[in-house]
Amino acid sequence: QAEKAEKKFELKGEAKHKFEKMIQDTPIDYILVSEEIIAYFKEHSTKALNDGIYVTLTDHIANTIERIRMGIDFDMTMLLNVKSLYREEYKLALHAIEMLRNAFHLHIDDNEANFITLHIVNAELTSNMMEIYTITSILESINTIVLQSFQVDVQDN
């Protein structure tokens, strides 16, 4: 017996168009696990998330699963401070990684949580992902200056 879709969310404009296209091109199991992860985020986050995350996170999950299955590794050094900059979101992202591991029986490195964290932050803000990367890069530069000038690591404080 097929499962009946029970969740409702509203996308408008470009996000709606992107989601409609994505549904045609994305395996249903990626969409379903993405919805489970987003439901977890919404239940455990102290901040509201816009529904655009259904498009961006599902697309990210699909690309991540395919990349891992093809054995393609990704350099995440530019995202090392995401954990300390967005602590709450990072914890949610780690749980999402565990959900993906369980759903797809793949080894997914915890570092992938950095990208998922940025998707959560993007959904909390009205900014786009490029602005989030820029903000994160600036904050990492500030952290480096503080570390070099005062020998104080603010990452874990």
What are these regions (language model features)?
Residues 1-157:
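A cross-family "folded-core" feature that marks the main globular domain of proteins
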